[in-house]
From Swiss-Prot:
Location, primary (coarse class): cytoplasm
Signal peptide: none
Keywords: ATP-binding, Cytoplasm, Ligase, Nucleotide-binding, RNA-binding, tRNA processing, tRNA-binding
Keyword DNA repair: no
Biological function: Catalyzes the formation of N(4)-acetylcytidine (ac(4)C) at the wobble position of elongator tRNA(Met), using acetate and ATP as substrates. First activates an acetate ion to form acetyladenylate (Ac-AMP) and then transfers the acetyl group to tRNA to form ac(4)C34.
Gene designation: tmcAL
Cell location: Cytoplasm
Top-level taxon of origin: Bacteria
Gene Ontology cellular-component annotations: cytoplasm
SUPFAM superfamilies hit by this protein: Nucleotidylyl transferase (SSF52374)
Binding site for ATP: 7-20, 101, 162, 187
Catalytic activity: cytidine(34) in elongator tRNA(Met) + acetate + ATP = N(4)-acetylcytidine(34) in elongator tRNA(Met) + AMP + diphosphate
Name of the protein in its database record: tRNA(Met) cytidine acetate ligase
Amino acid sequence: MDSCGLIVEYNPFHNGHQYHINQARNVSNSTCIIAIMSGNFLQRGEPAIIDKFHRTKAALHGGADIVIELPYTFAVQNSDRFANGAIQTLNKFGVSSVCFGSESGSMDPFFQAYKTIKNSSEAFDNLLKDNLSDGLSFPDAATAVYETLGLTEGNLDLSKPNNILGFSYVKAIQEYAPTIKPLTIQRKNNDFHDESINGSIASATSIRKQILQSDSMDDDVHNAIPIETLHQLQSYKDKTAIWHDFEQYFPLLRYRVLTMSIKELQNIQGVVEGLEYRIQQTASDALSFVDWMHKIKTKRYTWTRIQRIFIHILTNTKKDENYVDESPSYIRILGMNKQGQQYLNYHKKNFDVPIITSIANTTHSMLAIEERATKAYYSIIPAKLQRKMFKQELQGPIII
């Protein structure tokens, strides 16, 4: 029973995601589409606009057959670590192929780029180290190396976010899961970071911006998302009275930083090179989350990198809890349909890691972090409602 894996965040699920699912099913000729989705906190260090359970429902109604969770340990990381965790998890779940969106829609440039970098690994590492020593951020340092090696020319521009992620997927497949077939489809219309909605295919960034700025869903948003996403967004807002963004966590985050010792901050995952002092010193004068970010951000420390550190502060994720280099040791199912249930029944005897449907009565260290992350995510809603929303973690997967 062939399956195709998609590495996703669905923040929120939109028409472009539905197109991706449909195209992936066609190009892979798979009977089962498996989406591995980040939980409540995302790769760029952001809270999801609605929780993972409502996003799972939207994904299942949008064509995914199974949604499994990418553990927090891998989800809130740079592109390589994010990709490594996702690919290894999908491999353990038995997928035949992985399909991702790219600028060109062709695999050849990705294979060529991987071959070039692999053959120039020593030069790549040395150039990267030199660029970082010059004070460049990791993305800028890596892009400069790509330019030096001629990898920003032609069809594959590794300065583009989707191509960077796609390349990370291909690299992870080659190194950890060579039996998986990588596939790509060409992205439609909007760029990854476009902030305005132009038509029925729009970026998740533009959809979130429109929703959060207006605190409503206007005709442009309606046109860019499936009806089930509209229902899930509205359902979450009706229950909690909010859609999540970082500004709502600002008071709690600022309080955490101001009441932590320097040593405690030093122990937070991602805090290096004295950054703990800059984070704490700027907290006192910060008037908002965005204001605080502008005070901390430097050429070396990007917005995304700082956001990831802030998420780790919210979740109290420490350096000694960094399991990112470990192989995934469980697979958690968030939801599935009948096709997904058939896939699970067909393959379950072949899995070499436990399949988890709830964090109840589990003691795994990664799941302990997941539990903290969920509690941190819901911390900005009323206490009684927090308990109710958290109970979703203890229940079985969503079945449609």
